[in-house]
Structures are given as C-alpha cells and as structure tokens.
Amino acid sequence: MPSILIVDDEPGVRSALGGVLRDEGYEVDAVDSGEACLERLGRQAYDVVVLDIWLPGMDGLATFARMRERQIESQVVMISGHGNIESAVRAIKMGAFDFVEKSLSLEKTVLVVRNALRQRHLEAENQALRAR
C-alpha cells in the first residue's frame, strides 16, 4: 500500500487531507513540523511527502533541502497558504514534484499525490531495470 506523510502545522489540514487520502486507500501519517518530518523519515520510508512551506521552526524548504542532503527519495508535493511564486519556483527547482496552493482543493491534491506516486513507481522501476 502506498505511504504518504503529511507535514503541516494546521491540525485541520492534516485531518482533512489525511482522511481523504486514507479513503483513497493510502497509508497516511501526519506530523506538525519539519523536525518531526525528518525524524519520521529517519525511521520509515514514504512514497510521497506532502510538505507545507510555512512551518514553525524549520520551514518546508529547509526541510526539503535536508531531505535531499540525506538522499531521501520520496516524491515531495509542496503546499502553501501563502501562494508565493518565488517559493513555488524554488521548490520545483529543488526537485519537488508539484506545488499546490491552500485552500486545498482536495480533489486536485489527491490527483497530484496520485501522479507523484505514479512518478515514484516509474523511477523505482527504472532503477530496477538499470540494476539488471
């Protein structure tokens, strides 16, 4: 079962998005900070991380940079309630799969997560073929 980690400091976002993704059949965990995200990723691999840009403490872009330094291979979907084009462009240049603005359209977010999972599957398949 595909696994998703939601990282957002707003309990309502974690609850609503987590509920919809669970209804889609995904295994979902949620944390409220960048630090908690990195700690969780140190213990468990996730296929997709839905990561808020504006987090208290370590923000989402810094968290994403640390994920890349640690070579964590999860697909990352960045979300933000402060639709800042500069942040979106920076996240995509860093390797984020996509950027979704809050107020989250749950249908759009599910579609983006589904596409990120498809991309993750293709990358894993490609690596397996290269290893032969």
Regions found by a protein language model. Name each.
Residues 45-50, 55, 77:
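Active-site beta3 strand of CheY-like receiver
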